[in-house]
């Protein structure tokens, strides 16, 4: 029978690995009005702070704790006075505020996710104040800064759903007694892209333009030329091609992580009804699904 001790009020046998607290999902819509022309940024922000002391954990002493409600209010006020030019600059502003305002804050971490609003446009004319929700990839960022250190900035894309109906296959894989999957030269390829990249600390970055560039590269390597496509022998190859092209075209990026679920569409068997279904009617299969991941970084020699 296990025996449990009750004398952990002051214990020398355990130590903290990491601590933090904060406020998640602080939602803000910021409107910038330039006459009748309006611009918007809707974001959800999460903030985590690490303090120099642990007395709130050890003794229930809250004298160093910045209330999470104060953190929420601070984010709202910073949005008002600083605006949201990009979610990355907004996240850096939040980190710098808490580190400069409170000497006992030793680390600030901020996650910001942008709601994908797009301005109405018709025949090349942009509407002055109307927007449409366009879920074709969500822009997010993660910024971490420790006291006396530079901010480490990651940007990313998630929830970018793409599908092509041909120019994909999967052959030459290992087959054992449990393998039932047939080789296929032509199949549907569908995925929901998640990718995240880290910026070089010593470079000025146009975050909005860089995000647009990376998204365009992802779509380009997935789809290929518009008139004929591009063959993908595996999800892994497509993933790697995206990374190589991105680091080749965007010098501001140091490393890149991508996760691609392989979302299956299965041919529906209609033989019992006397019909031959030639990959015309498919069953979308939510799960289970394969998931392929990879992270690449620049070699040291490529930075010189």
From Swiss-Prot:
Its EC number is 1.7.3.3. GO terms for biological process: purine nucleobase catabolic process; urate catabolic process. It holds the Pfam family Uricase. The active site is at residues 23, 68, 264. The modification N6-succinyllysine is found at residues 10, 23, 221, 228. Gene3D superfamilies: Urate Oxidase. Catalyzes the oxidation of uric acid to 5-hydroxyisourate, which is further processed to form (S)-allantoin. This is Uricase. It comes from Sus scrofa.
